[in-house]
C-alpha cells in the first residue's frame, strides 16, 4: 500500500512544479462564474466584457444548480474570507485583479472596479488584441475557473465606422429568400469582432453586411448595414446585379470583392464623421463574369504593437486563363492596397501555356511567396516557393518544385493557419507543410468528395474542413490526424470560430454555438452525434502480445478497383478507438498500407484497453469441435470433427475470425458445407498446415459486417495534459533583442490509466524560420514519466523578423482542448523595453505634486520652474538661445527675451497655436516627463546645490522580465539638448571598451561612454537637460533616456581676473599712446635722457676735492 501513496505524492509535487503554469485538458470545464459589466450577470452565459473610457466594473456570482445552493456556497466563501481573482491577459500582457464582496439587489455578488489606465493607457485607434479573462477561486483542493473575453471597444478600428445605412432586423429578414451563400471574416486581433455578408441572387442588388462585437453569440449583438450606395458611388457608370462575392478584414483595412469589382476601404485607424468610403481597384479586361468567380486569399496575422517588417498582403484570383492582353489572373497587394500587381514573376508573362494560379500567399516569417498551381489539361498540381525581393516574387524558386501525386486531382486552395507557419493545401485531399512549402505531408484523402471551405481558431489551434457534400472534419494545427465530426444539413450556412475557440454555425436568421459553457470546445451538437468512422468490411484481429493487437481490413477479390479505398484503413483512423459490438476497445497507434497478405491491403496496430468479447458456443456451434487446418492453394481449408454432430459451420460464421494463440488468425470467407469452410490467413508465414486444434484451444471473434457491422471506430478521449510555465496565454509573443535569449518550458502529463511507459518523445517542435534564431531543445522524463521539454532561443544575426515556434503533442487525441501551442518569437525590440535613469535621490510622487521635498539640511530638492522658462546659454544667463520652453503658458510674457538672438529662438510644441496653458492639454504624465518633446508641460525638476561633482548617471533597462542595469556591450552617447557646455563626464575605459570606442567614435562623430560607473560634473547653474542614447548595433531598440538637473545657489563669479586684465590693458594702451604722441611731436625722450646724464657727469668732474670738503662742513 505504500507504493501507490508515494507515487501519488510524487505526482502531485511534479504537477505543481510549474507554479505559474496552467494545466490544460483536465476536463474541468464546468463553468461556475457568471459575470458581466453591462447590468446583472446572466446564468450560463459566456463571459463577454467590454472596455470603454471609464473604469471597468465587473459583477460576478457563483452559479450552482439553484439559487439556494449558490447562496450557501457564497456564505462558505465569505466566512473564509475568499474572493475570486480576475486575470486579464493577451500574448504580451498579464494582470491580476481581486474582487470585493458586495450586496446588489438582494444577491450577494463579487465586484471589482478597475481604472482603465491600470489595464491600458492607450486610447488611440489601432489593431489591438482582445484580452482573455480568467476568473479563478481556490477553495481547499478545488479550483473554480471560468474564461471569457475583454474587448477594448473604443480602440477596435472597424467599430468606429458606419460602413453604410443601418438596416432594421425586420427588414433584413426580407432578404433571406434571395441569399445564396454567406461569407464571414473576422478581425485578426479580436476574433469576436466579425463581419457576416450575404451573397444574393440577381433579383436583389446590393451589398449587405452585419458587424458583431460579441462573436455571434446573440442576434442583438449584430448590426446590419446596406453598403450598396457606398459601392455604387465608386462606379462611374450605371450597373446592375451588384452582390458580395468575398471579403477580408485585415488589421487596418476592409477589402470587399463584389460582382462589379474589388473595393478597398480607407484606413480604419483614422475615422471621420462621414461614412466609410472605398476605392475601386482596376483590373484591365475583367468583367462581372470574372468577378463573381473570384476569391480573396489572406494570411491572417495579428499586428498589435506592429513592427516595421509586419505588413498585410491580400491576393485575388480569378477562374480564367490568361489571354495575350492580360498580364495575369492572379493579383496581390500590400497595404494600403492601392497598387495590385500580378502574382507571377515577369519571366512567366510571355508564356502562353502555364498552370493556373489557384492561390498565392505571402509567408511573412520566411519572406517568401507560396504558389499553388493547377494544370487543368494534365490534372496535376504543384507548389512553388519564391523569395520576395522588394515585395516582388523572384522568378527563381527558393526550393525545388513540389509535385503532388495525380490523386490530388481537384485542388481548391491553400491557407496558412493563423499566427503560425502551418500551410494547408486542400481539395479532394488535405496536405500539410511545416517548412514553408518545401515539402508536404498527406493528411486526408476524400477521393470523390472535395473540401471547399476551411475555418480556423488561433486560440485552440482547431481547424474545421467542410466538403461539398456537407461533411465536416476537424483537426488541430500541425497534427497528422483528423476526425469526422458530422455533417451540415442546411443548404446555406457558414462556420466561424470566436476568440475563445467556440465554433459557430451561422445560417439565415439563426446563430448556433458549439455548446453552452459547460461543454467547452464541444462541437458535436452542431453536427449531430459523433459519427462512426468505421467502413463496411470485415476485420480480422491478430494478437501479437497480451496488450497489442493487429486488425486486418478485408478486401474481397471481386471488389472494383475504384472502390477499394472504401475497404481500407486510412489516416482518419489514426489515433482512434475500435469498439466491439460485444465488449472491448483498442487504441489505434499505427496505420499500415500493404499488398500482402492476399485479401488484406491495410491494417492497424492497436493497444488493447479492454479485452474483446469472444463468440460463445450458442452463437457459433462450430466451437464445440476440434479444428483441422490445411492449406489449399492461396486459402486455407477449415474442417470440423465429423464425430461431433452438433458442431456445424453456418452462413453466420462468414467473416468471423479464427484465433489460434501463437499462430496466424484466419478470416472465414465462405462455407463449403456444414463441416468445411475456406479462410485466408492474416500472417501466412506463421499459419499452421495440416494441424488439428482441440476444442477450447481455438476461438472466434466476430468483427464482420455480413449481418450488420459489429464494430465501430470513434475518436479517442483526451489522454494527455499539457502545461507550460511562462504565461497563462497559449499564444504568447516574446521579443529577443540582440545578444539575448529566451527559455520556454512545457510539460506533457499522461492521464490515461494503465498506459504503457514509452521512452519516446511526446512533443514535436517546429520552427517557422530556423534561420532567424538559434533554437535548441533539451528533453527529460521526470519521476512521474511526464515529458518535460526546455526550449532556448537566442538571437544570432543582425536581422529583425518573427517566427512561430510550434509545440505539437503528436500522440494526443483531437478531442483534447490543447494539442498545439504556437508562441511567436520576434527578433526585435519589445514595445515594453525601455531605458530609465535612476535618480540619485528618490522623491515620492506626492512630493512632486506639492513641489516640496527637503533634505536633512532643509534644502528643497524640487524646483518649480518659472513660466515660459528657458535655460541660459554660453553667452549669459539673460541670453537664452534654445528653442525649448519649460512650463509654457502662451498667455504669459516670455522672460529673458530682450536680445534679438533670444527673440529669434524659442518655439512652443505642445502649446503651439493655442492661447492659454489649459488649451495645451498637458496630461499628468507629460507634466512629469523628462522628454524634450513635452518640455512645454514640464513644471518641476530635480534641484541640486552648486557645485555638482561626480553625479552618478545610473541607467537600467526595464522590460517584461524585470530590471537590468545598463552595462557593456551597451555604449552610450550623452548630449545636452539646450547646447550648454559647462559640464563634463568621467567613466572607466577597460580594454574591450577602448577598442569599441576606437571603432565607433569615428563613425558616429561623437564621444562614446561606458555606462558602467559613468559620472557627471557640472560647473554651470540653472537647468541642464541631458539625453543619453545607446549606440546602434548592440540592440534593436532605440534606447533613449533624458533627465534634468537644476543647479541652484551658485556663487557670483570672482572678478579678479577681469580687473587685472582690464588694468593691464589700460596701462599698456596708455604707454603706447604716449609713445605715439612723442613720435608725432618729434620728441625723443631717450636722447634727452642721455644728454642730461652727460651734463651731470661734466659738472661733477669740474668740482675739486677741497670744495667738496668745504660743502660738507658747511652743511653740518
Swiss-Prot record:
Cystine connections: 35-60, 189-302, 330-343, 718-816, 829-1037, 911-920, 922-937
Transmembrane parts of this sequence: 1054-1076
Cited InterPro entries: CATSPERB, CATSPERB_2nd, CATSPERB_C, CATSPERB_head, CATSPERB_Ig-like, CATSPERB_N
Protein known as: Cation channel sperm-associated auxiliary subunit beta
PANTHER family: CATION CHANNEL SPERM-ASSOCIATED AUXILIARY SUBUNIT BETA, CATION CHANNEL SPERM-ASSOCIATED PROTEIN SUBUNIT BETA
Gene that specifies this protein: CATSPERB
Keyword Cell membrane: yes
Pfam families tied to this protein: CATSPERB_1st (PF21541), CATSPERB_2nd (PF21548), CATSPERB_C (PF15149), CATSPERB_head (PF22830), CATSPERB_Ig-like (PF22831)
The keyword Membrane belongs to this UniProt entry's keyword annotation: yes
Organism whose genome encodes this protein: Homo sapiens (Human)
Carbohydrate-modified residues: 90, 100, 118, 226, 321, 618, 690, 913, 921, 1010, 1015
Source species taxonomy: Eukaryota, Metazoa, Chordata, Craniata, Vertebrata
Annotated compartments: Cell projection, Cilium, Flagellum membrane
